[in-house]
């Protein structure tokens, strides 16, 4: 895949971004937005398949996804890429590097995407002067911990049907919070990538999607998914969908 040095760059402002309420605390004042705008580096546009960052690279910034979809992966012992997460517009990516100051995973664009770069040293400094910003990032870190716990529960205790139902509901909820249709969406990732994330074989993912389709729970046409009976899917996962 192409390295990220080919990315196009341009300047965007948090204060005028339609996704700012997803990335940032809603109570920021205009003057605080101005201070934040001043530290944001030029945003990047990435083509599908380009790396935003790679495991082992120095951690310097968080990235707010302005448009597009990403996956994060780590190399397993046998050399295969293990998918560890999917990130969409309005979400922050790159927090894996805060602890060790190096990234622990690769981040790859699943479609043409755009991100805003937030230099961490400046964001950390701003947090001392804007308490709501610091609190917001603590909440984001907490959400990552909760999600990791949810994935551990999912991989350890849930059947294939429950894992896939939880995954679809989680996507639905996240898309809905961004103003998209909750029950009608396109999967940006492959079935193989879904299987890697959920700890399922490709054949199991395809078979389970077909099972849901024949049972009238969903409609499947290639990557186009419609949730026809989301309530039955929710009953299947017993409230665990929010964590994956």
Feature-to-residue mapping (PLM):
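Phosphate-/nucleic-acid-contacting segments
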Residues: 173-244
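Cyclic nucleotide-binding regulatory module and flanking cytosolic helices
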Residues: 1-48, 92-93, 97-98
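Short aromatic/basic micro-patch
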Residues: 43, 62, 86, 117, ...
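Short phosphate-coordinating micro-motif centered on Lys-Gly-acidic
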Residues: 52-57
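Glycine- and acidic-residue-biased ligand/ion/polar-headgroup-sensing regions
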Residues: 49, 60-73, 89-90
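Cyclic-nucleotide recognition modules
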Residues: 83-146, 150
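Polybasic "coupling" helices that flank or enter modular domains
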Residues: 128-201
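A short beta-strand-loop-beta hairpin characteristic of the jelly-roll/cupin
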Residues: 70-82
């Amino acid at each position: 895949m192409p390295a990220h040095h080919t990315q196009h760059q341009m300047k965007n402002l948090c204060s005028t971004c339609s996704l700012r309420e997803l990335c940032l605390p809603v109570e920021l004042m205009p003057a605080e937005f101005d201070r934040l705008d001043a530290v944001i580096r030029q945003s990047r546009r990435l083509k599908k398949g380009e790396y935003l960052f790679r495991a082992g690279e120095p951690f310097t910034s968080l990235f707010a996804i302005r448009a597009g979809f990403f996956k994060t992966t780590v190399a397993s012992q046998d050399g295969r890429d293990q998918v560890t997460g999917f990130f969409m517009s309005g979400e922050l990516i790159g927090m894996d590097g805060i602890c060790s100051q190096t990234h622990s995973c690769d981040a790859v664009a699943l479609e043409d995407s755009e991100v805003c770069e937030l230099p961490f040293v400046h964001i950390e400094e701003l947090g001392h002067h804007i308490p709501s910003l610091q609190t917001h990032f603590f909440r984001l870190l907490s959400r990552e911990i909760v999600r990791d716990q949810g994935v551990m529960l999912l991989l350890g205790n849930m059947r294939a049907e429950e894992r896939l139902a939880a995954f679809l509901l989680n996507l639905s909820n996240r898309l809905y919070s961004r103003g998209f249709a909750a029950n009608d969406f396109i999967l940006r990732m492959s079935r193989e990538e879904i299987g890697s994330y959920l700890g399922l074989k490709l054949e199991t993912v395809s078979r389970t999607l077909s099972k849901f389709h024949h049972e009238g729970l969903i409609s499947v046409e290639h990557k186009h998914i419609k949730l026809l009976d989301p309530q039955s899917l929710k009953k299947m996962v017993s409230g665990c969908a929010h964590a994956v």
